[in-house]
């Protein structure tokens, strides 16, 4: 089955983004395909390259980066949500020497429609 994942939980403070990461791994282990992962609302913090967890904490941003590189799955951030939360790239930063969008995350207005329309399921993980 082909999936598009949508993550709205922050990189730290709640466990939703980590659960989404584990879910994405489990999908691939079961032979499913993930076309892309879209981060919106507080989930855009997963693409902040300036997040530095404590040495004894799991670095979720780095985990998403490695996951994307290993499986060739694009990671997209909502443009409006990332702008509001200060996650900027060279195109949107007032000072292009100071950006914090982590590679390979990219900013997109919406989940790419062609890909998401071809997906068999779009999954939005919600946690309280």
Indicate residue ranges for each PLM-predicted region.
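Helix C-cap/helix->beta junction micro-motif
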Residues: 30-31, 71
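A glycine-rich helix N-cap at a beta->alpha junction
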Residues: 53-82
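N-terminal glycine-rich phosphate/adenylate-binding segment common to multiple enzyme folds
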Residues: 79-128
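Short, conserved active-site loops that position catalytic residues or coordinate cofactors/metal ions
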Residues: 38-48, 81
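Hydrophobic beta-strand scaffold residues
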Residues: 34-35, 75
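Short, glycine-rich nucleotide/cofactor-binding loops
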Residues: 4-18, 47-52
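Histidine-anchored nucleotide/phosphate-binding helix
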Residues: 16-30, 37
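Short, conserved beta-strand edge motifs with alternating hydrophobic and charged residues
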Residues: 5-6, 36-40
């Amino acid at each position: 089955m082909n999936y598009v994942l949508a993550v709205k939980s922050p990189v730290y403070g709640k466990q939703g983004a980590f659960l989404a990461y584990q879910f994405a791994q489990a999908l691939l282990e079961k032979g499913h395909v993930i076309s892309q992962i879209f981060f919106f609302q507080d989930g855009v913090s997963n693409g902040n390259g300036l997040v530095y967890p404590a040495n004894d904490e799991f670095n979720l941003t780095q985990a998403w980066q490695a996951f994307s590189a290993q499986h060739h799955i694009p990671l997209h951030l909502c443009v409006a949500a990332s702008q509001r939360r200060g996650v900027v790239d060279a195109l949107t930063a007032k000072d292009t020497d100071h950006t914090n969008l982590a590679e390979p995350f990219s900013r997109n207005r919406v989940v790419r429609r062609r890909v998401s329309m071809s997906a068999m399921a779009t999954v939005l993980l919600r946690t309280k």
